[in-house]
């Protein structure tokens, strides 16, 4: 049981290296942005959606309360974090249109953020049983 807290603010640069937005909790104003279609890339569509939005507004507003519970299933599309590395790389290569070298450097930043920075936002909660 963990509580994932959001950063106090979420600029594009921070989202570039890590998807901090839980897609089941993220909302955007359709009247302002219009309908944004998700990418045809099978995985990481949610990350690309929020990157598209933050390209327009630069910083997202964070709601500091928990809005949902997320259940991790063993065989879900995103269960294997190692398998997702190639999909994250595809975000840099295809979505951002970066060359191989720059995308590789971005993956180093991504891994640093995932392994060092993002765990700071995860808090263990005590069971109420």
Task: Name each model-derived stretch.
Residues 60, 66-67, 74-129:
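Non-catalytic, C-terminal membrane-associated alpha-helical segments of glycosyltransferases
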Residues 1-83:
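Conserved nucleotide-sugar donor-binding catalytic segment
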């Amino acid at each position: 049981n963990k509580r994932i807290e959001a950063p106090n603010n979420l600029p594009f640069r921070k989202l570039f290296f890590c998807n901090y937005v839980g897609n089941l909790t993220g909302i955007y104003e359709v009247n302002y942005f219009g309908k944004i279609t998700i990418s045809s890339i099978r995985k990481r569509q949610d990350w690309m959606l929020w990157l598209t939005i933050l390209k327009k507004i630069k910083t997202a507003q964070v709601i500091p309360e928990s809005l949902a519970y997320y259940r991790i299933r063993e065989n879900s599309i995103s269960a294997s974090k190692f398998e997702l590395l190639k999909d994250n790389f595809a975000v840099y290569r295809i979505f951002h249109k970066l060359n191989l070298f720059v995308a590789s450097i971005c993956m180093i930043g991504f891994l640093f953020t995932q392994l060092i920075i993002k765990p700071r936002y995860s808090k263990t909660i005590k069971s109420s049983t």
